[in-house]
């Protein structure tokens, strides 16, 4: 898994615990799950360890190849993590093409969630709830 945020960690845990896959997380920040709440981190990280997942933090991915990932470890030493499959779970941004296409279609138009900016499911759901309450 390239990316150790909530999505990368949760997806990796699923593959490790349900399918028995050997999962390594490569994260550029100094820890995994930093975009998760404390209770989620306290529940998920021990389960990730129990499932045998490897976590490599403070790394810089250099290249994704046909058989794995080249990266620089926290000391700047080039490493290679062999993998049959690499999931890229990082760097999200808003895609506003659909928002632009819908502008002017109706008199009152509210943009929420990832249409506005990339965010977590929790944040997007709350924003959608607030927009719905404004209608009422």
Residue ranges and their predicted role:
Residues 2-4, 90, 112-114:
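Short glycine-rich loop/turn motifs that provide flexible caps or phosphate-binding loops at active sites
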Residues 1-2, 25:
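Hydrophobic Val/Ile/Leu positions in short beta-strands of Rossmann-like dinucleotide-binding domains
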Residues 9, 17-101:
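A Rossmann-like FAD-binding core segment of flavoenzymes
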């Amino acid at each position: 898994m390239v990316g150790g945020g909530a999505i990368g960690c949760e997806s990796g845990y699923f593959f490790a615990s349900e399918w028995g896959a050997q999962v390594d997380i490569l994260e550029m920040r100094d820890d995994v799950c930093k975009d998760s709440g404390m209770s989620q981190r306290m529940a998920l990280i021990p389960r990730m360890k129990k499932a045998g997942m490897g976590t490599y933090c403070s790394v810089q991915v250099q290249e994704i190849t046909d058989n794995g990932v080249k990266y620089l470890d926290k000391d700047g030493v080039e490493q290679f993590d062999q993998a049959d499959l690499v999931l890229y779970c990082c760097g999200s941004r808003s895609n506003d093409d659909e928002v632009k296409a819908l502008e002017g279609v109706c008199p009152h138009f509210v943009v929420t969630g990832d249409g506005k900016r990339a965010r977590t499911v929790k944040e997007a759901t709350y924003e959608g709830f607030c927009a719905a309450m404004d209608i009422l």
